[in-house]
Amino acid sequence: MMRTHYCGSLTEAQIDQTVTLCGWVHRRRDHGGVIFLDMRDRDGLVQVVIDPDTPEAFATADKARSEYVLKITGRVRRRYEGTENPNMVSGQIEVLGKEIEVLAASETPPFPLNDDTINVSEEHRLKYRFLDIRRPEMLERLRFRSKVTNLIRNYLDDHGFLDVETPILTRATPEGARDYLVPSRVQNGSFYALPQSPQLFKQLLMVGGIDRYYQIAKCFRDEDLRADRQPEFTQIDIETSFLNDDDIMDLMEGMTIKLFNDLLGVKFEKFRRMPYSEAMRDYASDKPDLRIPLKLVDVADLMQEVEFKVFAGPAKDPKGRIAALRVPGAGSLTRSQIDEYTKFVGIYGAKGLAYIKVNEIEKGIEGLQSPIVKFIEPIVMQLLERVGAENGDIVFFGADKAKIVNDAMGALRVKIGHDLNLATCEWAPLWVVDFPMFEETDDGKWTSVHHPFTLPKSSVEDVKSNPGEALSVAYDMVLNGTEVGGGSLRIYTLEMQKAIFEALGISDEEAEEKFSFLLNALRYGAPPHGGLAFGLDRLVMLMTGATSIRDVIAFPKTKTAECPLTQAPAPVEANQLRDLGIRLREQQKKEA
């Protein structure tokens, strides 16, 4: 062993012991002929003192610079009174260095690793990710991620789950996003697909009698990237047999409660279970942030006869919605603040943001301040009564197609709640249940809300006759407005699976071509089964307070799905393409 201790592990318990440390020079200081080195490794920092009484070590320390890799042997001693550092685990002690060996020199880093006040662009950090990872903040996040996966593995092992790997090279299936395709050299003209999830394989494992499966799986989706998306991401994938939806939710809830208690000291009570219809009605979101107590109220029925087309149109449209959002005590918002909120909802397609300020409700119309009151005067007091408005409140209105209203007003609810510090708690977990089985596309076709293997609550006959009314046995775990996990019970009979394919417009021929392996499995006695998957990256991001998934992944991609470190994706040699039977079309030269 090259070292006896980690830098960050030294405490007063090691005083008077001789230790050997290996790590990087975090900071070097020269004070009155004595050199101080802050040495850093994975576990933290320790101060090393080198004085001229050890000339060889002093000479080596004199040449050392930031990020040099050193091996230091010395004696642990208590720091002099008044020089302790309460911000370091090792802040009560220091190491008097006797021997120093330079294991590797370092060029000057492209950005300082010992000064968090200097703003470094994310692109630059990702280009030199091997240096960025050395920063204590990044090291701690990756260490925390390791603790999360370790706890999850132990929990699932203790509950009888088997860790089983599923293929990375598989075939394309319709799962909602574009596949990453891998050409086959042996089967020219054919392609593998990288898995968007292990969904079908884990179902086949249940048919195979594995009973309880889990995997920390890499998944791939070729989709537009946002702050919470990566082209490759990690999923905690879980499937069980002979458990119902309540059993599965209880099991996964227990794991989440243990995770937060053991790693953050946060104690959760029993998770609330909210039907999808209630979530959309009250919060305009299928992943509501319950830290914010504000709720939306439907008022379309009151707007049926008003002459104001902005309200009358959506009120009479079967696909429209008019929702009111009462914000208690926010009547003091200025016009410029309201204008900013109007711009904000515009991001989601809203054409405007109507509002009423309630100054003195006992005065009726005269006690209100609003540019829309004159258009809805006959029903305005009914509106305010329905939303429970009081003096000092402001009520916002969204009126449009239901999707636009939900997107805009749902986002506004959360933004105003945070802007005005209305959050009532730090963590708000819940389950959203009873999702619709299908949703209608613009061209009148049905598509799966989750995926085509989700078990409906309806019978085969009801699915065939009225798919729009079918609910699914699906459940999403939501935390602070973020979906951290989602799952369902699965279809386990051939008759139901064919009925779902039929509702989705998938012909028998197409189903056999794409899913023959699954359909065959259902012919041989599939058990009732279900499961879910957690997004590991998203979960760790929430638990560490990071602002982006990229901050909790060792080597992430950018928003354009590129890796600045390795410069992937990159062109390949012509002979490699030739072996794959692929020829690239030449791009037409741009006209000068």
Curated annotation (Swiss-Prot):
Keywords for the protein's UniProt record, in alphabetical order: Aminoacyl-tRNA synthetase, ATP-binding, Cytoplasm, Ligase, Nucleotide-binding, Protein biosynthesis
E.C. code: 6.1.1.23
Gene Ontology, cellular component aspect: cytoplasm
Sites where the protein binds L-aspartate: E175, R221, H450, R490
Site (Important for tRNA non-discrimination): H31, G82
Localization per Swiss-Prot or TrEMBL: Cytoplasm
Family annotation (SUPFAM superfamilies): Class II aaRS and biotin synthetases, GAD domain-like, Nucleic acid-binding proteins
Catalytic activity: tRNA(Asx) + L-aspartate + ATP = L-aspartyl-tRNA(Asx) + AMP + diphosphate
Binding locations of ATP: R221, D222, E223, Q230, E483, G535, L536, D537, R538
One Pfam entry name: GAD
Alphabetized CDD domains for the sequence: AspRS_core, EcAspRS_like_N
Region spans: Aspartate: 199-202
Keyword DNA-binding: no
InterPro entries: Aa-tRNA-synt_II (IPR004364), aa-tRNA-synth_II (IPR006195), aa-tRNA-synth_II/BPL/LPL (IPR045864), Asp-tRNA-ligase_1 (IPR004524), Asp-tRNA-ligase_1_N (IPR047089), Asp/Asn-tRNA-synth_IIb (IPR002312), AspRS_core (IPR047090), GAD-like_sf (IPR004115)
Source organism, top-level taxon: Bacteria
Keyword set includes Nucleotide-binding: yes
Single Gene Ontology MF annotation: aspartate-tRNA ligase activity
Listed GO biological process terms: aspartyl-tRNA aminoacylation
Family: Belongs to the class-II aminoacyl-tRNA synthetase family. Type 1 subfamily.
Oligomeric form and interacting partners: Homodimer.
Reported function: Aspartyl-tRNA synthetase with relaxed tRNA specificity since it is able to aspartylate not only its cognate tRNA(Asp) but also tRNA(Asn). Reaction proceeds in two steps: L-aspartate is first activated by ATP to form Asp-AMP and then transferred to the acceptor end of tRNA(Asp/Asn).
Protein name: Aspartate--tRNA(Asp/Asn) ligase
Species of the source: Acinetobacter baumannii (strain ATCC 17978 / DSM 105126 / CIP 53.77 / LMG 1025 / NCDC KC755 / 5377)
Gene that produces this protein: aspS
